[in-house]
Amino acid sequence: MLLDPLADAMSTIKNAENVGKPECIIKPASKLIAMTLKVMADLGYIGEFEFIDDGKSGMFKVKLLGRINRCGVIKPRFAIKVAELEKWERRFLPARNFGVLILSTSQGVMPHTDARARGIGGHLLAYVY
């Protein structure tokens, strides 16, 4: 039974990276997964990804670059303010300026660095480094 599609997607990416596969398939597809993959692609952690319609919920085909050491979701999805970002960075990232927290904000899904620059908080979704 699939309870958290985003957690399943991050687990699939992490396992495929650990084995050294050049690409992976993420099922089922959702808008939240698409926005999270876009943030990861913009930051250079993954290559291109494309949506494949299979007549059901769809799937994503993701090109892997071998740049992810670890990735995962943050549960429960804590609501944080801008001032609390550093506390959560220390908890989930291994070093300062290494890796990224992915947040869902009122202005869309973005990395924590963009949220800090814009001065907005949001809900923690995932971490990647």
UniProtKB/Swiss-Prot annotation:
Keywords in UniProt for this one?
Ribonucleoprotein, Ribosomal protein, RNA-binding, rRNA-binding
* A Gene Ontology biological process term: translation
Pfam families found in the cross-reference section: Ribosomal_S8
What PROSITE patterns does this protein map onto? RIBOSOMAL_S8
GO cellular component terms, alphabetically, are:
ribonucleoprotein complex; ribosome
Report the transmembrane regions from the record: none
Tree of life domain: Archaea
Gene3D superfamilies in the record, alphabetically? 3.30.1370.30, 3.30.1490.10
Q: Tell me a Gene Ontology molecular-function term this record carries.
A: rRNA binding
Q: Which HAMAP family match?
A: Ribosomal_uS8_A
Assembly and interaction partners = Part of the 30S ribosomal subunit.
Assigned protein family? Belongs to the universal ribosomal protein uS8 family.
Q: What role is this protein assigned?
A: One of the primary rRNA binding proteins, it binds directly to 16S rRNA central domain where it helps coordinate assembly of the platform of the 30S subunit.
Which NCBIfam families did the record assign? Answer: PRK04034.1 (NF003115)
Q: What is this protein called?
A: Small ribosomal subunit protein uS8
The opening ranks of the lineage are: Archaea, Methanobacteriati, Methanobacteriota, Stenosarchaea group, Methanomicrobia
Q: What is the gene name?
A: rps8
